[in-house]
């Protein structure tokens, strides 16, 4: 009987897992071409929520913090992307700019936020979300207010859908890798007991800040 190393077993399992994933991706690309625009918009919305849910799970699930301000970073990235598109920037560059702006915002906000715990942390993140919404309304000359921004309809809908699919696949892959990584174990340890995690040498403050940055980007 052949003996396989752990690495070979993991690679074999990964190869087997890629078969249904490739089939699912092919189906997601074919469905909009068969059922038209309604199916494309519906699947685009689902992919968007999958991306949001998995990015939220880094702080809300792996770290175990009740985190009510995730929409702030999502909105910041979305508005940055929309403003870049409105100024005739390429779609890929606009998406990159959105992520690049969310990263320093999360890094800065993580410093005061993670001095708080429990319900106080949850209320603080909710307050930031409400503050972001109020700023959006007050700066309507720039953000479009409650109506949002109107973008030039010069992008191929299937290209936008394909990018959303690629983004969601990247987020799923990164989340899966994170769960099995050292950082993922540190997040789980911090969730169970910050005191115990600190006692074995885990820098809980740094781990929590990294979690928020991962989640925001």
Predicted feature residues:
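Transmembrane alpha-helices and adjacent helix-loop boundaries
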Residues: 1-217
């Amino acid at each position: 009987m052949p003996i396989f190393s752990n690495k070979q077993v993991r690679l074999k399992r990964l190869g087997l897992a890629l078969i249904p994933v490739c089939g699912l991706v092919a189906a997601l690309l074919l469905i909009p071409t068969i059922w038209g625009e309604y199916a494309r918009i519906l699947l685009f919305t689902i992919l968007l929520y999958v991306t949001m849910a998995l990015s939220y799970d880094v702080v809300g699930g792996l770290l175990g913090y009740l985190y009510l301000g995730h929409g702030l970073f999502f909105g910041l990235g979305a508005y940055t992307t929309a403003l870049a598109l409105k100024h005739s920037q390429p779609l890929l560059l606009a998406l990159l700019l959105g992520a690049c702006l969310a990263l320093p915002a999360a890094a800065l906000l993580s410093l005061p936020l993670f001095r708080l715990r429990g319900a106080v942390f949850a209320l603080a993140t909710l307050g930031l979300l409400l503050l972001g919404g109020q700023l959006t309304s007050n700066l309507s000359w720039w953000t479009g207010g409650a109506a949002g921004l109107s973008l030039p309809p010069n992008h191929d809908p299937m290209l936008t859908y394909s990018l959303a699919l690629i983004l969601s696949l990247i987020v799923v892959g990164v989340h899966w890798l994170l769960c099995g990584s050292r950082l993922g174990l540190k997040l789980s340890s911090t969730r169970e007991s910050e005191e115990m995690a600190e006692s074995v040498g885990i820098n809980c403050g740094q781990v929590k800040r990294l979690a928020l940055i991962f989640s925001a980007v």
